[in-house]
A protein has these predicted regions:
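Residues in the short beta-alpha loop(s) of Rossmann-like NAD(P)-binding domains
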Residues: 31, 54-57
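Conserved active-site beta-strand element of glycosyltransferases/polysaccharide synthases
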Residues: 206-209, 216-217
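Short, high-confidence coil segments that cap the C-terminus of an alpha-helix
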Residues: 47, 102-104, 131-135
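Short phosphate-binding loop-to-helix
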Residues: 57-107, 117-120, 124-127
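Catalytic metal- and UDP-sugar-binding loop of GT-A-like glycosyltransferases, i.e.
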Residues: 110
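A short, N-terminal amphipathic alpha-helix
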Residues: 33-49, 61-62
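Conserved core of the sugar-phosphate nucleotidyltransferase
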Residues: 87, 91, 115-203
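N-terminal nucleotide-binding beta1-loop-alpha1 segment
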Residues: 2-21
Length: 225
């Protein structure tokens, strides 16, 4: 990887959670989930700044205790159930740049609710971005169900068909193109694509593949068990 690049890592922690209230600061192994993400970012040794963005007072008051370099108050319009996350990430990057008078080359976001990722996953995703022409990198695990084989959509009249059709029907899942479940563990961008476009996917987006056992994205009480 290019050692002279400036890198920032954000951990965006929204106060509201419909599925699991307060899930971002629920404890796992004795630490709030967002604190685990902060410590993973620090252990990677990749980042010039690790920034936590939140609208939750509890998080804003304690994030720097767990190692964050800076906290950003997430605007109310970016913290509702209907708000997309990417604008909040871009806002955190811009705010940190203004505070530290720095401009970052690579922007990374770690989802607090993906605690099973390891430092090697963060390093691998960043390396994939920096050694290719990718505008962004997502992470995911190979999916067990396939839109070419055993995922269907209901159309007009209630009739169903496979979600994606090929000229020749796929009769074995193994013969279908590989598909992946996004796991939200790591997102990586070249800065301009995040800050100017505020999107995840571009024509040159790549995926860093993780094993299923590290791909948990906590979204229910059952996931904590």
């Amino acid at each position: 990887m290019e050692g002279l690049r400036m890198r920032i890592c954000t951990i965006c922690v929204r106060a509201g959670s419909t599925g699991v209230p307060g899930k971002n600061w629920r404890e796992l192994s004795g630490l709030p989930l967002y604190a685990l993400a902060v410590q993973q970012a620090k252990k990677s040794g990749l980042f010039d700044r690790v920034v936590v963005s939140s609208d939750a007072a509890e998080v804003l008051e304690n994030a720097m205790f767990y190692g964050a370099d800076y906290v950003v108050v997430r605007p109310p319009e970016m913290a509702s159930d209907k708000a997309a996350k990417v604008p909040a990430i871009a806002h955190a990057v811009r705010t940190a740049e203004g505070h530290f008078n720095e401009t970052y080359d690579v922007c990374v976001d770690l989802d607090a609710t993906s605690p099973l990722r390891i430092v090697a996953d963060i390093v691998g995703a960043v390396e994939l971005l920096e050694t290719t022409s990718a505008a962004s990198v997502i992470t995911g695990a190979e999916s067990h169900r396939s839109p070419y084989f055993n995922l269907v959509e209901e159309g007009e009249g209630g009739f169903v068909s496979t979600s994606k059709a090929l000229p020749q029907a796929v009769v074995r899942r193994q013969d279908a193109p590989k598909t992946y479940d996004m796991n939200a563990a790591v997102y990586v961008w070249q800065r301009r694509f995040l800050v100017e476009e505020e999107a995840v996917f571009f024509p040159t987006t790549r995926i860093y593949v993780m094993p299923p056992e590290r791909s948990l994205d906590i979204d229910s009480e059952l996931d904590f068990k």
